[in-house]
Amino acid sequence: MPPPPPPPRRPALGAAGASKEENVYIPNFISKRPFYAVDEGENTDYLEHQRIQKKEKDTGWYDRGKTLGPAATKYRKGACENCGAMTHKVKDCLSRPRAKGAKWTGRDIKADELVQDVRMGWDAKRDRWNGYDAREYQAVVEDYNKMEELRKEMQAKAAAESGKAIEDGDHYAETSDMSKHQPTSTRQLRLREDTAKYLLNLDLDSAKYDPKTRTIVDAGATNDKTAELYAEQGFLRQSGDAAEFEKAQRYAWEAQEKGGDTSLHLQANPTAGSYMRKKLKEEEDAKREERERQLREKYGGEETKVLPDAIRQMAVTESERYVEYDEIGLIKGGPKGVARSKYKEDIFHNNHTSVWGSWWSDFKWGYACCHSFVKNSYCTGEEGKAAWEAAERQRTGSGLLEPAADAEVDGAREEERKASEAETAAAAKEKAKKRTAEQMIGDVTEAELDEYRRKRTNTDDPMAQLLGRDELVT
């Protein structure tokens, strides 16, 4: 009896293979398709409207530079005035601005571009590499390969001329870019054959090394190799052959940068580098001596070769004197000179003997030599001063006033005159008290009455208080 057939396989659940049978335990408001959901008709998944609808991302890009067809032969109305294309205006034209556009010349009319409707998603709009064609980088690779071929040809040519093979050197020597402009302290931060200081003494029982923090306590010991290395840390050697070593290293780097020659490596081939440096120095000295000899033959100067004492004293010489400068660049404790103004001083114009602003009067600046208020005027000297004083006296009326000394003399004379007049008046008054018989019998005459009226003081007269005074009212 044959075995029974296997049970049928249950269909896969999901968006593609969903169950055709409805689940009675799913509520109606979930399983019912809303009115706005699109019904494809053939879909058997009654819960499709509840599943995540994954759509393919549109990452398309327009074809840059694609045209609709061949270019027109003459200018068309409404086209770009610069290039003649119908798909854009002159303000949106990306072609080179012409002195005379295609509208006026009718030449070199560009074809119409294909305007594509590119609708991208959120990620596609923000993709910096969207639309990039990797084939564009092929031009960079080709340029690099051409330069590499030229470099190899030059090396082969140089090897044929010199008669020795040029080694390529290790990868580090070719790819490292140690510029001569880079500080020496940066290039020599760490040597590859250097040993870390915490590896010099790994004795766990020693008080010098702390295994927990992996540090050496108190900078190591005092009389061993570790202490010597710590003493040299951060110290730039300037004695012995340090300067010569720096020159040799710099020469090797410059030779590699200029010609790509790695045979003058300082550590790999120090003898060749030293020989080439010595040879180059001898050639430079020979050229300099030859140049000096030619100049002496042409212009002479054997007798003036020795520098004069004045020039020799002006030369900068080394000194051990310690000099300290302040924040503005002056020597501390040095003599303080008079600060010079940035403006020109003691420069007199137009025959003046003083500068403008050396005299002040009536809220005005002027020249003290001639009392002139006009800037850049011609100096008149003492005559100008006298003219100015006369003008001031005429303007203020000070010339009508008496000098102080004359006023004192006149005051004394006036007092004497008043005293004499007072005595005369007193004597006349005493005499006037004695009336004659005629005066006692007779009446007042017309002349006496008129004199009385003339001499009578009117109290209402505003000038009455000034009577008897000889002072000038100003």
UniProtKB/Swiss-Prot annotation:
Pfam families: Slu7
Region Disordered: start-end pairs: 263-296, 395-437, 453-474
Family, per entry: Belongs to the SLU7 family.
Function in brief: Involved in pre-mRNA splicing.
First and last residues of each zinc finger (CCHC-type): 78-95
Keyword hit for Iron-sulfur: no
Domain of life of the organism encoding this protein: Eukaryota
InterPro entries, per the entry: Slu7_dom, Splicing_factor_SLU7
Subunit-level organization: Associated with the spliceosome.
Keyword check for Zinc-finger: yes
Keywords in alphabetical order: Metal-binding, mRNA processing, mRNA splicing, Nucleus, Spliceosome, Zinc, Zinc-finger
Biased composition (Basic and acidic residues): 280-296, 410-421
Cell compartment(s), UniProt: Nucleus
Protein name: Pre-mRNA-splicing factor SLU7
GO biological process, one term: mRNA splicing, via spliceosome
GO molecular function: pre-mRNA 3'-splice site binding; zinc ion binding
Entry GO CC: spliceosomal complex
